[in-house]
Amino acid sequence: MCHIILLGMNHKTAPVEMRERLAVACRQEVNPLRLLPRLENVDELLFLSTCNRVEFLFTCRDRDGGLREVTALLRTYLGLDSTEGVENHVYAFRGMEAVRHVFRVASSLDSMVVGEPQILGQLKSAYREATEWRTVKVILNRLLHKTFSVAKRVRSETCIGSNAVSISYAAVELAKKIFGSLQDKRVLLIGAGEMAELAAEHLLAQGVRHMVVANRTLERAVDLAKRFRAETTPFDHILNALKNTDIVLSSTGAPEPILKYNDVRARMRERRNKPLFFIDIAVPRDIDPKINEIDNVYLYDIDDLQGVIDLNREERKREAERAEHIIAGETLKFQEWMATLNVVPTIVALREKAETIRRSELQRTLSHLPHMSEKDRLAVEALTEAIVKKLLHDPIVFLKKKADRSTKDMYVDYTQQLFNLADGDDGEEAPAVTVQMASAGNDGTLLKTFEPDKESPWRKS
């Protein structure tokens, strides 16, 4: 039996320390796909790695053996030794749960910021690498193509990516509206907490190439900068950094403003009054409101963003529900396709036998018609192909319709006996494909995950 399994960790399950390992591993460009030939139980493999997520999507015959091998692969990728556990930070989905999860990831329903577009491009890159390494075959090829079409449906039929639902996202969207493209803008992030992290995620998604992080604790600034390909500057050098900055986004926990009117005014002279935009999303505020009075300085605070956020949150929730409905329907369609794989060996055998008979009879007939022109020979061959195709159409459609029913085996057996398909083979039927339906709540949250057996790598000693 063939199982579809997804094993991974993301921003919801892994602490900052583990996610930092993800960022380091991602930059090393070490591709685990090259190790597939060493995995005895894994048939197909796709590998997705971002700053906030690492996932292995694979098919295998032996579920526990496959999980054990891919867990070891995850350890290797993260550079963990045998004493460092990952079990508490890893999730695993199988069957249609895995399919549904991939659909949700591609549709950005499982992202740190619901609706962000970056993850789909990352998943496409992962699939492109897998095809180059030839680690995907029939099942994962079909699944990934379906995944991309599902994500496209979600984008086109919902407004999931249209409305900002976090202060950080709204701040970046505001900057985008002000400047248009952010690719050539220099951004100074003050603070390295969760809001700064989210802002960095959005800025990166918008193509920002010049980002500087400042934080009272330099180590935190360095950690954030590593994960988002940014630079750092000491906290007491913030004023100096203003000289070459277009956008300042501040989100510290300081009890009083860290940027004062007189300080900013002095730096504006050095900038020759080049426009400078401040987005203050801290509470209490990081930036003296009075700086808005300085020429060519534009200040926006959290109150300017919050009203938009409140309106958009309900709209995004409704759009997410619509997206989940699309995903549920597409998951069922994929389940139906998977079920047809159970009858594929019989269908293939039926077509091959019909083709063998067609060619044999055609050759025998044409041998008695030596004076027939090449054009007429081709016409007769096309005729026989069309007849065979039409004769097989109804029984093949019938088998596919019965593929996901409990009586499937009976109909497969009848077909094999009726057309004498077992004649001359070894009597063994091709491996079946195990399909399991996902359990999910109305809000799209996971209700069940992989339950380990006694020999599973997840069980603690």
Swiss-Prot record:
The active site is at residue 51. Its EC number is 1.2.1.70. Transmembrane segments: none annotated. Pfam families: GlutR_dimer, GlutR_N, Shikimate_DH. Gene3D superfamilies: Glutamyl-tRNA reductase, N-terminal domain, NAD(P)-binding Rossmann-like Domain. Substrate binds at residues 50-53, 111, 116-118, 122. GO terms for biological process: protoporphyrinogen IX biosynthetic process from glutamate. HAMAP family: Glu_tRNA_reductase. NCBIfam families: hemA, PRK00045.1-3. Belongs to the glutamyl-tRNA reductase family. During catalysis, the active site Cys acts as a nucleophile attacking the alpha-carbonyl group of tRNA-bound glutamate with the formation of a thioester intermediate between enzyme and glutamate, and the concomitant release of tRNA(Glu). The thioester intermediate is finally reduced by direct hydride transfer from NADPH, to form the product GSA. Homodimer. This is Glutamyl-tRNA reductase. It comes from Syntrophobacter fumaroxidans (strain DSM 10017 / MPOB).
